[in-house]
Every structure is written in structure tokens, then in C-alpha cells.
Amino acid sequence: LLLKGEGTAAFLHGQTTADIFAQKQLERIFLSCWLSTKGSLKALLEIRIFNNLAEIVIISGEINSIIDGFESVIFPADKVKLEVLKPIRRIQKINNYQSWKESTPVWISNSDLMENEIYDHTKLTKKELEIWKIRQGIPGFDREINGETNPYELGLGDIINLDKGCYLGQEAIARFFRSKALRYQLRCWEAYGEADNFD
């Protein structure tokens, strides 16, 4: 997705959990959550903002829901326009020793694709990718991201800025943070041995 216009930063600041104005100064890709009014996670986003443009990649979430959600609250006074871009390729080096949130992905437009940019990397199989996502605790759409869970329950509390001021879902997030009580918590565990030993 692409947001453009002089109100881009202010609009995203009010719709997501990141401090957009602080991130804009860094000119890098960063993570943010898009929440419901009750503080449940609707989508996990990567955002890169520069000048009056914001590129948005959906890590987990439903694109039409995000488009509808954004467009329903964009008013002429916001001075922002939403566009749907062609899909891109996202390259992320992965390992099991560092959080996926600490690594910097690379976005490549299919029209700018150079063969060596792809061939320098080994592509994971679908099974390897699923195992890595489980180990890393990356929430999946329609599983962990189900309209009921909040970012703290999904291990995403570190990408919520509690000092940034008003944003969608802020009041609910403040309550979750103060209560410290989680109904659920996303965890990963591994077991070794014969399958019969785990009955």
C-alpha cells in the first residue's frame, strides 16, 4: 500500500502504534500494529516513510480490511490518499538466534528485480518457513490474529509506543498495560524423543 500527501505522517500516527514522527526522521523500515478500537490486533505492518509518502507492507493481516479501514477514516482535511501498489518481493535473512524484529528486511519491486539479488539468498521451503515463524512467534492471520488477541498477548508489546499520544485502540492498550493480566500468551516449545513418549 502507498499513502501519499502532506498529512501522511499525521494520519498513520493516529492509526498505528508506532511513533511515526520519530520514525520518519530515521528513514528506515519499521514495524507497527494496526488495532481495533478495543485494542485487538488487526494487522502487523512494516512501514517506510519519507517526505510525504509512506510505503506499507502487510506482514500479517487482510489487505481489503486495511484498505476499507483506512479509507473509512480518511477525510479531505487529512490531506492523504491511499493507493494499492503491485506486490513486491521482501527479503529477510533469518536465523534462530536473533529476533526477526531486529533484522532489517529488503523490499524489491518486481520491476527492479536483479537476478543476483534473489540468487544470493537461499529460499526456504514452505515447511522451513512455517517452523521458523513458530520459533520466532510470528502471529498468523486467522490464527493468532483473530480479532480477539491484543499485541501483548502475541509478544508484540515492544512495538507499541506508549508515549506517543492518541491513536486507534490506545485506551484499550493502556488498560492492558496497566493490568498486566494476559488471557493468553503466545509461546513456543520443542520436544525431543520418540512421538510415543508424548502421549
Region spans (language model):
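Basic, glycine/lysine-rich polyanion-binding surfaces/domains
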Residues: 1-199
